[in-house]
Each structure stands twice: as structure tokens, then as C-alpha cells.
Design a protein with these regions (language model features):
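Juxtamembrane/interfacial segments around transmembrane helices
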Residues: 2-7, 42-43, 74-91, 445-447, ...
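Membrane-interface soluble catalytic domains
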Residues: 376-500
Length: 500
């Protein structure tokens, strides 16, 4: 038996393989082919305007966030979330103290109802910092400053707006959760965290349950920035992006693409009106513009008439967007639904700045928030006391529309007549510093202690740090601690709905 086994089994022997140039050439070709494919697979697209896909993109293909696990695979989820514990719940106070100090739950919302059943159009205007608008800056440059948005200047004379209004974030992907769901950016953009798979409500889902038809419009590639996924997750019925634009025979398709991000604002806003015209009333239509953005280019027909001015390349693009908005409103004003509509105009964030007042830690968040009703039912005025922020937009619209059901939002109804005007606040986060604006004070908190307090209304350049010298510091610090703890705990425990 041993002899047979010895004869039948192959005896091991050393063999030396020599690879010729064919082998190395084939491996090089394989690398050159597979490496770009791997990069495209990781990014999700080859276009510059598309961010690498993340776990929140799964929301685009499911009806509820809880179903996202069917779309996601384990290795991808691990790669995208490993080492990303963005939300760590602090232990500043007991849950009871936290609830008593601050709660995002609007249990018994005060409503107006005088605008009940009206349509809503929300225009999120790319990079429309308050510095670009002459209406807010009449004293700049010795009173000579005119800004770059004359149409917005004219609209503001017919609108409700705020002298002290702020963005909650510094990039575009921070804006949608803030404006449409009342969720400010804290530590990391919501889209990029595992919490993006939480159950989230939004003005679209709330109005959808009241019988509104809903649509979201953005002229970039449909998977760009995760906008379509988030819009789907908060209940928008239809999404119109570059794909839908290119299917319309009425427009120029990719000839209207800016070469980097999206369809130029002017044609895309007209395309938006075409589709709003076909929506069943009442409707909620949300539009996110794109042209006032790096690389600061213009459609060919405007390159001679709109030239560089004011020292910043974005200024000519802001003028183009202003012109596009003018033509949007000129055409919208001829629609039968126009006078029965509430328009909201708000920036996603600020951009290039020229004046020192807009280069401060607060000025970098200074944006317009504008409510306009063509029928004049909402009083046109500039509120010079109330502090407003992006997360206040959903509660304020719900007030106007008579929505009286409980909901959750990290913002307030700006039109609550029973509210002390000095009690409104705005929150932002940047590079490890939490920032709270309330009354006439701005407080900066590093997660452990207050590092700065400024009277920003009388010290707009934030030169006089009053930390440790004001009695208001302690209650403001307690408030921001409760706000942070509420946000972190709700993110980690998937409690972003009222009934959760």
C-alpha cells in the first residue's frame, strides 16, 4: 500500500516561472482599465458635480429609511461609516433638565390659518450671501454700495424679511436638512453620516399628508450631492434634475449645461415653471439654483454684458442669477396660481466676501430669508429685532398654512405673536466650535466651555470678547448644551419624528 501511494502521488519539485514582457504588459493594461472603473464605482459618477456616493444615497431607492438595508451591502456600509462616529451624545445634564431647557418638539403649534390651502414655492438660491444685496447694505462704502441683485432689492420692498438672518451651515448639502426638515448641521453634514438613514420628516411629507402635491427641482445630475435621495426620503413625490431637463424637447439639453455642475439657472427656472404649471393645487415646489458657484462662468450670450466687477469673480454670476430670478417671477406672475402662493427665498450659504463685516465668524453665515405673498396678505417689512435662521422656515410656513399637528424641528415659528422677539436664536457649527446667536449676543462654545461672547449688534466686527463678564453667558451656555445634547441623542437613537 505504501509503495502504491508513493508511486501514484506526484512528487513535489521546484519549478521556476519566468514572466516575459507579455505578462507585465497585460498586467499594466489591466491596471489602467480597472483603476478608473474602481474610481468611478466609488464616486458613483465621472462628473465633477457629483459627490462620491454614500449610504444616504440608498434613500433614493426605498420608500422608508428602514428599508435601506435591502439596497446597501455590508462592505460598502462598513467602508463609508468606519471611524465616523460623528454624533457623540454628551452628558451635560439629566434628560429632564435637557427637556426643560430646550426641546425641538412643537407640541401645540400656534397657527395663523389665513394662508391655509395656499401653494408654496421655496427658492434655495446658491451662494446668495447678504453682502450681495444692496437692500441690506445701504451704509456700506459710505452709502455708495449698490450690490449685485437689483431684482432681489425690488422684491424685498414687498416682502417680510429679517435684518439678522443666518445659515446653519457653510456648504450646499447642509441647506436641505436645515430648510426643509429643521435639522441644522452639527459636526458633520447629515448626508454623510449613518444617521442619514434615520426616519426624518420634512415640510414636504407634512404637507403631502394634507393633500399637497410636491416636487423638487435641481439642475445638476440627479445623483449629485445626494439631493434626490434626501428629497425622496422626506416625501417629495417628484424630482426634476438634469435627466428630466434633457428629455424635454423644448430646451437645449446638454447644450445648456455649464460644463461643471448643472443646467444654467435661466433655462432651468423656466423648465421649473413648465412643470409647476402642471402640478395639482395646492402644491409645494422647491427649487435649488446652481449658477452662482465656482468656477464662476456664464452662458456665452452674457459674457460681454455681465463682466467681472467688485473684485470677486462670483459677482457677475450673482447678477446672472438675479436676472434669471427676475424672468422666473415675470413669467410666474402670469400664472393663475401666482397670487395664491407663498414664495420663500433663502440662500444655502454665503460665498466670497469683500467687506470686513461679512468676514467675521458671524458674517460668514449672514444670508437673506425672504417671505413674499403676491396678494399682499403678509405684511411687507424688515424685522430689525428677531434673529432668524434656516431651520425657522419650516415652522413659519406651517404656521401660515394653519398646520396644527405636533412636529419636530430645531427651529421656531418666526410669526408667533406670543413669543418674545429677543428669545429667537440661530445656531451654527464650524471647526469644532458651536455658535449661538440670541438677542444681541453671540456665544462660541467648544464643547466644554464658552470661549467667546460678543455683543454683535454694537460690535459687528467681533473685536471685544466679553467672555466671563456678562450674566447672560450662563443661561446661553446652558441652552446650547441642551441643544447639542438633544440633537446628538436624537440622531443616535433615531428619534427625529414627533412620535419617536
Amino acid at each position: 500500500m505504501v509503495f502504491i501511494l508513493w508511486r501514484c502521488y506526484t512528487r513535489p519539485r521546484l519549478e521556476v516561472y519566468r514572466f516575459g514582457y507579455h505578462y507585465y504588459l497585460s498586467q499594466l493594461i489591466a491596471l489602467l482599465v480597472l483603476a478608473p472603473l474602481a474610481i468611478v464605482g466609488i464616486r458613483g459618477s465621472v462628473t465633477a458635480g457629483t459627490r462620491p456616493i454614500t449610504i444616504s444615497n440608498a434613500n433614493q431607492f426605498v420608500n422608508r429609511p428602514v428599508e435601506s438595508s435591502v439596497v446597501l451591502n455590508t462592505p460598502f456600509s462598513m467602508i463609508r461609516s468606519i471611524g465616523k462616529k460623528a454624533f457623540v451624545t454628551p452628558d451635560y445634564m439629566t434628560p429632564e433638565q435637557m427637556e426643560a431647557t430646550y426641546s425641538p418638539v412643537h407640541l401645540h403649534p400656534v397657527t395663523d390659518g389665513g394662508h391655509k390651502g395656499k401653494n408654496v414655492v421655496i427658492l434655495i438660491v446658491e451662494s446668495m450671501g447678504k453682502e450681495y444685496i444692496g437692500y441690506f447694505n445701504r451704509s456700506l462704502d459710505g452709502g455708495r454700495y449698490k450690490g449685485y441683485m437689483p431684482f432681489i432689492d425690488s422684491l424685498l420692498t414687498q416682502s417680510l424679511t429679517y435684518k439678522y438672518s443666518y445659515a446653519n451651515g457653510r456648504i450646499s448639502m447642509d441647506a436641505m436638512p436645515s430648510i426643509l426638515s429643521g435639522l441644522p448641521m452639527m459636526v458633520e453634514p447629515f448626508f454623510l453620516t449613518p444617521a442619514s438613514l434615520n426616519d426624518v420628516d420634512g415640510i414636504s411629507s407634512m404637507l403631502g399628508r394634507e393633500g399637497y402635491s410636491t416636487a423638487f427641482f435641481h439642475g445638476a445630475h440627479n445623483i449629485s450631492m445626494g439631493f434626490s435621495a434626501y428629497a425622496h426620503s422626506i416625501g417629495y413625490e417628484r424630482y426634476y434634475g438634469l435627466d428630466e431637463y434633457c428629455k424635454s424637447p423644448k430646451y437645449g439639453g446638454m447644450d445648456d449645461f455649464d460644463g461643471k455642475w448643472a443646467i444654467w439657472d435661466e433655462p432651468f427656472l423656466q423648465f421649473t415653471l413648465d412643470n409647476i404649471h402642471d402640478m395639482k393645487q395646492p402644491f409645494l415646489a422647491t427649487v435649488f439654483t446652481a449658477s452662482s458657484h465656482h468656477p464662476y462662468s456664464l452662458p456665452e450670450q452674457y459674457r460681454d454684458s455681465l463682466t467681472d466687477e467688485g473684485g470677486q469673480p462670483i459677482h457677475k454670476c450673482v447678477r446672472y442669477t438675479d436676472l434669471s430670478l427676475r424672468r422666473f417671477f415675470e413669467r410666474a406672475s402670469r400664472e393663475p396660481w401666482y397670487r395664491n402662493t407663498i414664495f420663500v427665498l433663502v440662500a444655502d450659504h454665503t460665498n466670497q466676501t469683500s467687506h470686513d463685516i461679512y468676514k467675521t465668524d458671524l458674517g460668514l453665515y449672514s444670508i437673506p430669508i425672504i417671505f413674499f405673498t403676491p396678494d399682499g396678505q403678509l405684511e411687507a417689512r424688515t424685522d430689525e429685532v428677531t434673529v432668524a435662521q434656516q431651520t425657522d422656515i419650516t415652522p413659519t410656513l406651517l404656521h401660515l398654512l394653519g398646520y396644527d399637528k405636533p412636529y419636530l424641528a430645531f427651529g421656531d415659528d418666526l410669526l408667533d405673536e406670543g413669543r418674545d422677539r429677543g428669545g429667537y436664536w440661530a445656531f451654527s457649527y464650524n471647526a469644532g466650535i458651536y455658535q449661538l446667536v440670541k438677542g444681541d449676543l453671540m456665544l462660541q462654545f467648544d464643547g466644554t466651555k464658552t470661549t467667546a461672547v460678543y455683543r454683535f449688534k454694537t460690535d459687528p466686527l467681533l473685536k471685544n470678547n466679553l467672555v466671563g463678564r456678562l450674566p447672560e453667558q450662563q443661561p446661553m451656555e446652558q441652552f446650547i448644551k441642551a441643544l447639542i445634547q438633544q440633537y446628538m441623542s436624537r440622531m443616535n437613537e433615531n428619534r427625529l419624528l414627533f412620535n419617536s
